[in-house]
Amino acid sequence: MNRLGHKSVVYHGDLRLGELDVNHVSSSHEFRFPNDEIRIHHLSPAGERCPPLAILQTIASFAVRCKLESSAPVKSQELMHLHAVCFHELKTAVVMLGDEEIHLVAMPSKEKKFPCFWCFSVPSGLYDSCLRMLNTRCLSIVFDLDETLIVANTMKSFEDRIEALKSWISREMDPVRINGMSAELKRYMDDRMLLKQYIDNDYAFDNGVLLKAQPEEVRPTSDGQEKVCRPVIRLPEKNTVLTRIKPEIRDTSVLVKLRPAWEELRSYLTAKTRKRFEVYVCTMAERDYALEMWRLLDPEAHLISLKELRDRIVCVKPDAKKSLLSVFNGGICHPKMAMVIDDRMKVWEDKDQPRVHVVSAYLPYYAPQAETALVVPHLCVARNVACNVRGYFFKEFDESLMSSISLVYYEDDVENLPPSPDVSNYVVIEDPGFASNGNINAPPINEGMCGGEVERRLNQAAAADHSTLPATSNAEQKPETPKPQIAVIPNNASTATAAALLPSHKPSLLGAPRRDGFTFSDGGRPLMMRPGVDIRNQNFNQPPILAKIPMQPPSSSMHSPGGWLVDDENRPSFPGRPSGLYPSQFPHGTPGSAPVGPFAHPSHLRSEEVAMDDDLKRQNPSRQTTEGGISQNHLVSNGREHHTDGGKSNGGQSHLFVSALQEIGRRCGSKVEFRTVISTNKELQFSVEVLFTGEKIGIGMAKTKKDAHQQAAENALRSLAEKYVAHVAPLARETEKGPENDNGFLWESSEDVSNKGLEEEAPKENISEL
């Protein structure tokens, strides 16, 4: 219940506007303006599509300090004008109080108590930055670097890992495990040789081809900063870059592995020059190293401009927790409007962990095919999750918050304000009982160095000029086992493709080995090398646990297959949690699991070829199947949102079949054409043929052109499904015997199994922007 407080004089600059009564919103907390003067500093930018009350409820929920109204018998014309300008132009009157701003929001009144305002308190600068993001339908995304986007090694870290693997191999008796570790050892040694040639001569031989270092100028990020020119060798076909953190010190040379599918994620974030996300980096690495790694990831500075780079790349101490508040220091974004992409959740503050989408750690040496064999690479999954989060956030903002805000009046109680959207509501944490999207066991040694070693070795290298200590490497402290999330697209590849996911050795069923010389976190992952400990002289009791295919989770914890990412411009209906989120489904042969075979159900088609539109899935949860055997849950929509009334879903299906076919054609790089032909049937006056790269794959005849299109697209999908099943069935039968005889594990065959999966793309924007 509001209660009368006191009067305050309102000024705009030095101009006196009149007096307003200050009504407290809580009897336990009385707010007073200094000297009982309300000095308006400026008016905020116009909200355009966003009313100020909706913005403030999003970034400062229920932070109403007081209410202002006029009790004067004759209303001040200046105050009435201020109220009218703020109300109709979607602005606020801003009072500066130290590090906070008091925003006067012009309110409608049931009792016509004009002028009247609600006063919100927010950190200085936060309102303007969040207003800009909400107007442009933009959120923030924070990336980790090491083992999330890149893996980097120096000569020293390569030598440590090579010696550790040699020690394990010398104690191993199982020839299969020896072969697996030997293959991993060879990968380390090959890259070490590349790095050594680069350090010694500024060139390297790759498969007999001479690659000379090319000078790359690092543009200064601030005035007065000296230009830096680094010798760089790029091997794009291997996602590998050789660079030097400090060009004058050769021992700061680093071999960097860039995670596959990064380009797809990067292009989604900046598609059509319209920012969907403001990008930040939070890492435990040394700053020069972090800046160079990000330059390799974003060479054109499209994601983070040069003038913003110093503020947006945040380096925290290795023993400290990451925090969104520290990332957004200065009030540039509210944590409720931000999500995180990281391979570890526990390195973040507890309050930020619900906003973290966990990706599997990037392991290019331990499991080199873990990325390429997936139907949907890990970073494409992260892109889909980001798309879902953004779509649901603004869906709730537009259709729930803003519609409710329009019904709020000055006389209403503050505690009755509608809840605001929060990114944490849409980043759904996965069942920890299984690893999603082909996640594999963590390797016994980190792929790159960790923690504060980076800065220590850089400083030592600089002091010794040409010392043997490396400059930098994988600098992230990784204190706990990953906890993946279910906001993923299923990788329902054939068993032959799934086999290619594994390292080239069988997994161990033994317990975790003791790894002398490493420190461990609660989750069992090695954190970093202890200073002064040489792992080459340590006694390693056991070889590493090798990777195995993740076990299929219980049916109760699994979502039904199908669905697709929410197109962020579709603005789908929010059902309480994001749809289109799936666990991984790799076949296995352990007792009690589903049998291994080419297809246990027709719906086990590749999800990126056919997937379900979000609205149709909610209205048809039973997963009705078409006559051709394609589950409607697997049809993908790349266009507008579809609505169906009860059983009358024909209109939605028409667009669904056509858009699914176009999606398949786009992913295959094939042209899909609908050609109208003359019908010889008097009743069915329209006839449409579907051509797939010139080949006719379907025909439809109906009384209307729309129905003919639908029928033709549906028949074409059936034809493609039959061809697909006929193609993958022999491949699946070849591997059917192996998993049953080997306790459900799939081994990599001696021949390379090519991944013929269709490349995942960012959601196509073919409708009007949000």
From Swiss-Prot:
Disruption phenotype: The mutant cpl2-2 exhibits multiple developmental defects, such as a dwarfed size, early flowering, small leaves and poor fertility. Increased salt (NaCl) sensitivity. Produces shorter hypocotyls than wild-type plants in the light, but not in the dark. Enhanced accumulation of intronic heterochromatin (HC)-containing genes functional full-length transcripts (e.g. It catalyses: O-phospho-L-seryl-[protein] + H2O = L-seryl-[protein] + phosphate; O-phospho-L-threonyl-[protein] + H2O = L-threonyl-[protein] + phosphate. Residues 656-722 form the DRBM domain. Coiled coil: none annotated. Residues 134-385 form the FCP1 homology domain. InterPro entries: dsRBD_dom, Fcp1, FCP1_dom, HAD-like_sf, HAD_sf. GO terms for cellular component: cytoplasm; nucleus. The keyword S-adenosyl-L-methionine does not apply. It is found in: Nucleus; Cytoplasm. This is RNA polymerase II C-terminal domain phosphatase-like 2. It comes from Arabidopsis thaliana. The lineage of its organism: Eukaryota, Viridiplantae, Streptophyta, Embryophyta, Tracheophyta.
